[in-house]
Amino acid sequence: NVVMDRAFPVIRDRILENNTPVVDSVTAATFSSYGVKAAVADAMAQAGLEVEDITMTTAGPEKEAKTLEDVTADIVVVGGGPSGLAAAITAKQTKEDVNVIVVEKMDILSGNGKFDMNFYDLINSEAQKAAGNEQWTVNQVENFIEAKSSAGDSPERVKVWAEQENVLDAWLRDMGVNLDYNYGAMNHMAKEDQYAGEVIQAGMEECARDLGIDIRTGTKGLDLIMEDGRCTGVTVENNDNESYGIKAQYTIIATGGFCSSKELLGEYAP
């Protein structure tokens, strides 16, 4: 299970460390956390031990607020989904000794990306070649760009997307992410019965950790640090109610959530 595989180690450790199932749920895995906590509480009750009823809102005691010393990095990425991990991995692959920190407010990475069934509109992929599908010509790519361009998706963005898809496919394959099931012309899954998002996220997470990227889950960005009109990092707060600053030469915002902002939608996609 794409959620439970990530959530179980976190909720297990919390229960063992506190010697009780009355602990905070894993953010982004509320139902999975509830199932584990309820099962532990039931086992304790059957053993004759006292434990309070477990509900969907059961949480551990509130932690005292603390302010920690600031840390430094070359690059800090806010958001641990596919785009944030892609930025962090690319930075590390480009310059091996660069110090990269990724902060993600949820306890597990990816957000909704891990639930994506398809990788849409992948052009001239290895899976298409293996299936014997005719490779797109320059004219076909240009027609695709024209058809996909709209007020909400500029021709410039679509052009980069269309012309670099095969490069992206090769990049993913280099980290063991093989989208080998091609159907419906440009739709791709890992296998016929395996979603693309699950495999992409797992491969990117493994690659990021192998590269030595500092990934801090349960850590939300609070505000940008601005000095003389320039962003020099971000202030964060973790699940232990500890806040601190991450000072960095470069700050990358990859939090998503654009469609939840009425103001941004009104300005850029009316």
Briefly describe each language-model feature range:
Residues 54-72:
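A short, basic/flexible loop-to-alpha-helix module at the beginning of a structural domain
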Residues 1-58:
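Active-site- and interface-proximal helix/loop "cap" or "latch" segments in soluble metabolic
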Residues 70-73, 240-250:
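Core beta-strand elements of the Rossmann-like FAD/NAD(P) dinucleotide-binding domain
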Residues 13, 174-177, 253-260:
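Glycine-rich, acidic and aromatic/proline-enriched surface loops and short helix-turn segments
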Residues 241, 249-270:
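Glycine-rich loop(s) and the adjacent beta-strand/alpha-helix scaffold that form part
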Residues 217-231:
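A conserved short coil-to-beta-strand element within the FAD-binding core of flavoproteins
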Residues 99, 105-214, 263-270:
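Conserved N-terminal/central alpha/beta ligand/cofactor-binding core
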Residues 70-102:
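N-terminal Rossmann-like FAD-binding beta1-loop-alpha1 element of flavoenzymes
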